[in-house]
A protein has these predicted regions:
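Contiguous beta-strand/loop segments that form the cofactor/metal-binding neighborhood of enzyme cores
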Residues: 1-68, 104-118, 138-141, 152
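A short glycine-threonine-serine/GTX helix/turn-capping micro-motif
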Residues: 2, 93-101
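Mobile, glycine-enriched helix-loop/loop "lid" segments at the mouths of ligand-binding/catalytic clefts
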Residues: 62-85
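Short, charged, low-complexity loops and linkers
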Residues: 85-94
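Short, charged alpha-helical segments
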Residues: 101-105, 125, 132-135
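Glycine- and charged-residue-rich phosphate/anionic-cofactor binding loop of Rossmann-like
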Residues: 113-132
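C-terminal lid/capping helical subdomain adjacent to the catalytic/cofactor pocket in oxidative enzymes
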Residues: 127, 131, 145-152
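C-terminal hydrophobic helical "lid"/dimerization subdomain
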Residues: 130-142
């Protein structure tokens, strides 16, 4: 017997966001896939503009892709930088970066941020960022339910 599912398997959120420095709007798309054939706990990041962009996936963390517009042609390049961590590691850059390394980097960022020693490195997700993420997903659910645009 099938059980009704009350969650979304896959979702695409199409939004408009404003640049706070000049109030210009730009399109923003968030895509979530709970069911993604061939993927297992894979995170993707993609930022594509009119003349450039970047793509990254945890499925192949040793590379990232860049997009550029050159002489009217769209050019994608694959960059293999090796890994350079924000915080020193015992194994160094000649070995493959793995889950334990990622976990230690997260802990290092947390404690550095807590002690005010983060410097120019990325910090942990803030409470405000989490709240805003929940607002976006709640608006998406309401938009789906009402078949209308929801302002946040």
């Amino acid at each position: 017997q099938q059980v009704p599912c009350d969650t979304f398997d896959n979702a695409v959120l199409a939004m408009r966001a404003k640049n706070p420095s000049n109030d210009r709007e730009f399109p923003m798309y968030w895509e979530m896939k709970r069911i993604a054939p061939g993927e297992s706990n894979t995170f993707f990041f993609s930022a594509i503009g009119m003349t450039g962009g970047v793509r990254f996936s945890t499925k192949n963390p040793a590379v990232y892709h860049t997009f550029a517009l050159r002489n009217g042609e769209q050019v994608w390049s694959e960059i293999q930088p090796g890994h350079v961590t924000n915080w020193p590691v015992i194994t160094g850059h000649i070995f493959e970066f793995g889950f334990p390394d990622a976990l230690l980097q997260m802990w290092a960022a947390y404690f550095a941020e807590r002690e005010g020693k983060l410097g120019d490195r990325f910090g942990c997700a803030t409470v405000a960022e989490v709240v805003n993420s929940h607002k976006a997903f709640a608006a998406a659910m309401k938009s789906h339910e009402t078949r209308s645009e929801i302002s946040i």
